[in-house]
């Protein structure tokens, strides 16, 4: 769907984006993560055709020349004419994107229904809450049925209920198009994304599948629970270190690798212990993200 190779953007003596390369596949949701100033918004604006890259290649559906009719874009702070109603604004936006008046009216009702604003279609935008404006921006980005949707911090201004609803919309949208979104809300990325791209100082620090990222950054911390008493016996194992007992039958500790975990389970069986829980600590995306950006 989208291929980015060696993308760079410079402003005089400042390199905002340095040699960025990644791919977004059809019906895939990719999260672009990174601290403030990492180059996320600049990258998204180049992909949307709003900024020209200093160098590098962007291909959409194999074509170097971006067809902006195939792209939907929601900026972090969407701007509206406050005196317009949602219906008027979407008609205006649709006509600018080349839709006929009749087609606009057909699509507007559908989009307002999808984003949950159908009851506010004739209310002036100046009276909208921040969350309602974000939804209207999403409706505008989807009006012309793009193949590739770019969302810059789409849930940053929303309350928990609004955030959940927008994430639910994103899950539905990726069935029909490719989605690339930036966010600081790492838990939200964990809910909807297939791939992650982590940027730092204008460069990519890591990219790939979320599960692969977690596995690469995983610690060797394990939890073991048994019906019997662990205390005293566990210390005898030379491959077990940093033991912390939650209670006499449950402990958290470190092992050098998963093979040591298998050895420990074998020792438990030989000892006649009844294992009720044995698991390796799974890190959240936030834990992994902090490791990558502070590396």
Curated annotation (Swiss-Prot):
Keywords linked to the UniProt accession: ATP-binding, Nucleotide-binding, Translocase, Transport
SMART domains in alphabetical order: AAA
Binding-site residues for ATP, renumbered to this chain: 34-41
Annotated PROSITE patterns: ABC_TRANSPORTER_1, ABC_TRANSPORTER_2
InterPro entries hit by this protein: AAA+_ATPase, ABC_transporter-like_ATP-bd, ABC_transporter-like_CS, DrrA1-3-like_C, P-loop_NTPase
Listed CDD domains: ABC_DR_subfamily_A
One GO MF term attached to the UniProt entry: ATP binding
Residue ranges annotated for the ABC transporter domain, each copy included: 2-226
Keyword ATP-binding in annotation: yes
Pfam families for this protein: ABC_tran, DrrA1-3_C
Gene3D superfamilies per record: P-loop containing nucleotide triphosphate hydrolases
EC number: 7.-.-.-
Enzyme class: translocase
Induction or repression: Expression is sigma Y-dependent. Induced upon nitrogen starvation.
Family note: Belongs to the ABC transporter superfamily.
Listed name of the protein: Uncharacterized ABC transporter ATP-binding protein YxlF
Organism: Bacillus subtilis (strain 168)
Lineage: Bacteria, Bacillati, Bacillota, Bacilli, Bacillales
Annotated gene: yxlF
């Amino acid at each position: 769907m989208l291929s980015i190779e060696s993308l760079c953007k410079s402003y005089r003596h400042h390199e905002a984006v340095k040699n960025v390369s990644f791919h977004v596949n059809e019906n895939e949701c990719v999260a672009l993560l990174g601290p403030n100033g990492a180059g996320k918004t600049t990258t998204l604006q180049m992909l949307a055709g709003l900024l020209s890259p200093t160098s590098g290649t962007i291909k959409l559906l194999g074509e170097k020349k971006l067809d902006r009719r195939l792209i939907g874009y929601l900026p972090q702070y969407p701007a509206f004419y406050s005196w317009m109603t949602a219906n008027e604004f979407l008609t205006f936006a649709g006509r600018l994107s080349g839709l006929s008046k009749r087609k606009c009216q057909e699509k507007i009702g559908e989009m307002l229904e999808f984003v949950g604003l159908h009851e506010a279609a004739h209310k002036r935008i100046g009276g909208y809450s921040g969350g309602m404006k974000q939804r209207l921006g999403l409706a505008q980005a989807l009006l012309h049925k793009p193949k590739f949707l770019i969302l810059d911090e789409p849930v940053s201004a929303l309350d928990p209920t609004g955030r959940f609803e927008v994430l639910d919309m994103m899950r539905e949208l990726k069935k029909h198009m490719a989605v690339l979104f930036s966010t600081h809300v790492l838990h939200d990325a964990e809910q909807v994304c297939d791939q992650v791209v982590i940027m730092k100082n204008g460069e990519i620090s890591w990219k790939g599948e979320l599960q692969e990222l977690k596995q690469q950054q995983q610690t060797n911390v394990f939890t073991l629970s048994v019906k019997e008493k662990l205390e005293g016996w566990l210390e005898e194992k030379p491959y077990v270190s940093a033991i912390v007992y939650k209670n006499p039958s449950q402990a958290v500790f470190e092992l050098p690798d998963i093979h040591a975990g298998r050895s420990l389970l074998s020792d438990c069986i030989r000892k006649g212990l009844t294992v009720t829980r044995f698991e390796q600590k799974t890190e959240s995306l936030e834990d992994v993200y902090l490791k990558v950006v502070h590396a």
